[in-house]
Structures are given as structure tokens and as C-alpha cells.
Regions:
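Cysteine-centered iron-sulfur cluster-binding motifs in ferredoxin-type domains/subunits
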Residues: 3-25, 263, 293-294
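N-terminal [4Fe-4S]-dependent radical SAM core
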Residues: 1-2, 111
């Protein structure tokens, strides 16, 4: 365990190993189990433990700190980006910009953007995740608009917080379990037909709540029941568009390339649907990039803590995007949005990053 602790953080979590291992060994599962054992035997560093237990597991504290950070970032902010940081932080923004925390998160905008539908076909509860709530709220608005356009009522449970992935990924399953219980309760109370997440990592985490809470049978059963309702945005919308006869290829126009999120493709198995949605968007022509399913190098904490390793991975992704000649790089993961938007701003400013929800929302009302 002592040797494992030295190397475990260098796993970027891309799950590429599951595709190349000839023995089909569940390497990600082994790493996750070893992380849990390491925490049980050796504990977490004090600062990390305090952050997980007192910030991530406490919605009000976590969200209050994010709101304060949106004020504190002002000296370094340029529009919606942070392009330069001082002193020892400078390396974080050398080859990529960082997204600024929004002045007004999605949860504060929701009541004004969600339409009241007379006879909705379904009731959806939207799990935004931290990044879409506080960094990319406009994309969260797009998700709501697309669902409303499908005659789906959307509600936003106020008590939702982080999905718990950053905590669980570092082996602190006790705190992750506390977070899971909070989210299960929040979404049970929403009484929705379906729960929509526009982040594949959050979707995967919700699906794993039953396993996470397996030692607490009552909560595990509740979590499994709830997890069965959780759908990833692109796969769900593609299904609904297909039913409505709206998943038809458009005449083309702007070149759009697509980056496959690691968790989207290799965990959820979703890769055809996002492409069909792009092709269905009026005025969009899909152009595939080389190695579209290779990691962008973000992987949450990894992309910040090991920026020197993350940047070469990002550069390869940027080179592949530029080679397509695309005007837009579409993504379907809020974590990848952080990395790719930042990389494009510094290395390919002529290319814009958009979540697929944004592309679809822009096309609402346009004739096919």
C-alpha cells in the first residue's frame, strides 16, 4: 500500500486500459479498491479530509465558497475566462485558459428560464453538477430549453450538490456516501419520471450510488431505484428526437468536430447518439477528428495537480481539432468543457467549444 500511494494519483481515469488489456482485467476497479484501502489504512491528508468532510459534504458551505470565489477571481478575469495567474500558479494558465466562475449560477436563474407547460409528456429533474451550475450555467439553460422543446417539464431540486465523484475517486467512500444520500433524498422529493444529467461522469456516479451504499441496505435500495431513472442527456434526447422524427441529417454548413469524453464512451457506451444530434442540427456538418476518443487530459483534480502531464495530452487534442478545419468542437461533458475551451482559447482561438445542448438549443424553431 505504501508504494501504491506514490503512484495512484497518476491514473488519469480514462479507462483506456480496459480496451487494451488482453486479460480483460478490471484495472480501474482494482485501482479504486486500492484507493479505498489506502484511505482506510493510512487516512487522507488533513487538508483534503477537512475539505471533503466540511465543504463537499456540506452543500451550503460549498456553494457559498463558490459564490465568494466568483468575486475573488475578478482581478484575474477577462470576460468568462482567466488567462493569467500570478507567481506559482502561473503554470496552470500557461497553455490553457481557465473558466471563470459565473456571477449567477444556474440555480439562481432556473425559475426564469424553465417554461410552465400545460400538458407535459414527462417530468424531468435536472442534475446540473457543480461545473454546469457554477461555471457553465448558460449550457444548463440550453439543457432546459431542449427538454422544454420536447414538451418535458423540468424541475431543479435545490438541495442537490456535487455528485461525489471527486471524493469517491480518491477513496473516501464514507464522505461520498453522505453526499449520495443527500442527492438521493433531493431527487426522490422531486418525484420525476426521469433524471437528466448532461455530464457523463455525474451520470456514472449516480448509477453507482447503489453499490456505494451497499453496506446500508435501506439506502442502497432507494439509491438503486433512483439510479434506474438517471439518463445521460445526449442519449435521452436522441431517443426522443427519433420518436418525434427529428433525428434527420441536416443539409450541413458549419464544420463541427466532436470530442468523445472518456466516461461517455467507455463507461456509458454513448458515442453514436451525440454524432446523430450534431448532424441533425441545422447548418452543421460533422467532421471527425483523429483519435476523437483519446482523453483531453483534464480528469478533474489530475489536470490541475499535474498540469505538466496534462498539457501535452491537451496539445495533442488541440492539434487533432485544428487539423479538421472545424469552426466548432462539440463536447458532451462539463469536465472536458473546462479543458477544451481553455486549450482552444490559447492554442486555437478561431475554434469555438460548445456543448451539444448548446448546438441543439440554438436550432430550436429553425426549419429542417
Amino acid at each position: 500500500m505504501k508504494d501504491f500511494k506514490k503512484i495512484n494519483e497518476l491514473c488519469i481515469g480514462c479507462r483506456r486500459c480496459t480496451e487494451v488489456c488482453p486479460g480483460k482485467i478490471d484495472i480501474p476497479g482494482l485501482i479504486e479498491e486500492l484507493r479505498v484501502r489506502a484511505v482506510k489504512e493510512q487516512g487522507l491528508p488533513f487538508a483534503l479530509k477537512a475539505t471533503f468532510e466540511n465543504v463537499f459534504a456540506n452543500r451550503k458551505v460549498f456553494h457559498s465558497l463558490l459564490r465568494l470565489a466568483s468575486i475573488g477571481q475578478k482581478p484575474f478575469q477577462s470576460g468568462k475566462l482567466i488567462r493569467h495567474l500570478p507567481l506559482f500558479l502561473a503554470g496552470l494558465a500557461k497553455d490553457r485558459s481557465l473558466p471563470a466562475i459565473a456571477d449567477k449560477p444556474l440555480r439562481d436563474r432556473f425559475d426564469k428560464i424553465a417554461r410552465k407547460l400545460e400538458k407535459p409528456a414527462k417530468r424531468a429533474a435536472f442534475f446540473s453538477g457543480c461545473t454546469m451550475d457554477f461555471v457553465f450555467p448558460e449550457t444548463g439553460e440550453s439543457v432546459v430549453k431542449v427538454l422544454n422543446d420536447l414538451n418535458i417539464e423540468v424541475v431543479f431540486p435545490e438541495e442537490q450538490s456535487c455528485c461525489g465523484k471527486p471524493v469517491a475517486a480518491l477513496g473516501d467512500i464514507e464522505t461520498a456516501g453522505r453526499i449520495a444520500r443527500r442527492n438521493v433524498k433531493a431527487f426522490e422529493d422531486a418525484k420525476a419520471d426521469v433524471i437528466i444529467s448532461a455530464c457523463p461522469t455525474c451520470t456514472e456516479t449516480f448509477h453507482d450510488y447503489g453499490e456505494l451504499l451497499k453496506d446500508d441496505p435501506a439506502w442502497a435500495e432507494r439509491a438503486k431505484k433512483l439510479s434506474a431513472k438517471v439518463r445521460e442527456f445526449c442519449s435521452f434526447v436522441a431517443e426522443e428526437y427519433e420518436k418525434a422524427g427529428r433525428l434527420k441529417k441536416s443539409k450541413g454548413g458549419r464544420k463541427v468536430t466532436y470530442h468523445d469524453s472518456c466516461h461517455m464512451r467507455r463507461v456509458l457506451g454513448v458515442h453514436v447518439q451525440p454524432r446523430k444530434l450534431i448532424e441533425s442540427a441545422e447548418g452543421c456538418e460533422l467532421v471527425e477528428m483523429k483519435d476523437s476518443d483519446k482523453c483531453c487530459g483534464m480528469s478533474g483534480i489530475f489536470g490541475v495537480k499535474y498540469a505538466d502531464l496534462s498539457m501535452p495530452i491537451l496539445k495533442q487534442k488541440m492539434d487533432n481539432i485544428k487539423a479538421t478545419g472545424a469552426e466548432i468542437c462539440a463536447v458532451a461533458c462539463s469536465g472536458c468543457m473546462v479543458q477544451i475551451q481553455g486549450g482552444l482559447d490559447k492554442q486555437a482561438p478561431g475554434v469555438k467549444m460548445k456543448h451539444i445542448a448548446d448546438l441543439l438549443a440554438e436550432n430550436i424553431g429553425k426549419k429542417k
